[in-house]
């Protein structure tokens, strides 16, 4: 029997039991498609995560300060963090207090509930990339907070694209206009561009947002202490060294109580997310592999039935 005869015989066997052949192929098709889709989705998500980390910058670190005992930050002050950066300017390039909570804003008769409010310093804006260091958003109108705005606790703000559109009809019209936060009027000095990807939203960004000087935010929140600081190092390569410097200062400040603070780098956060994604991908691939195995068993079953029928 030559190859042509074997091929015709195989086609005849397939067409003899069309439903059986269809179900067999369906099992394999679903199994293979599942593996392809899962791997494609995993690679896509991985790419989006890497893109967002690159946008935020691997030279960024977050330091949480909870303090000792009753949870207060004791006598730790933002000026201590500024002094730390100044003393280690070869490794650290800046630090910003970071106060975040949801606030209610008003403009005339309009009310905006659950707007994300960020209290920061001028360091939160990277003048080289002309974007925020916590979300990579660029300005479309105006400017960001300045050193004098923060130092003098000026009632000025930078808002997101959603807020600019809904409250004022656009970014250009928003400049110089006023928004009320807890009865205090804040003048809009800048408008950020619109977020485009779900990854940016998942990273904590939102178009419904407003930036104000951090001490103003503390006053609105009714808090005394800053519990989160955002540092930047000279490069991604010096991030680990910068973290060691920050942790060393806090270790001494809190007299060896390592539960009083926590510092994490963007690289560490990315590695954690990648590890979690690896576990999820492993589970999904295992499920897809089971589908392939079931399909393979189905094929073996059909082959056995076909051979049995031919030998009778």
Say what each PLM segment does:
Residues 1-30:
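N-terminal Sec/SRP start-transfer signal
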Residues 8-12, 288, 297-312:
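Intracellular coupling helices
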Residues 17, 45, 63, 84, ...:
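Generic structural signal for small/hydrophobic residues in well-ordered secondary structure
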Residues 19-47:
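Short, strongly hydrophobic transmembrane alpha-helices
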Residues 22-32, 174, 278-301:
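Internal alpha-helical transmembrane segments of multipass membrane proteins
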Residues 42-116, 123, 147-148, 166, ...:
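Hydrophobic, regular-secondary-structure patches
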Residues 74-77, 86-91, 170-172, 180-187, ...:
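Mechanotransmission and gating elements of multispan inner-membrane complexes involved in transport
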Residues 98-99, 110-220, 224, 241:
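Hydrophobic secondary-structure segments that place a key small or acidic residue at a functional site
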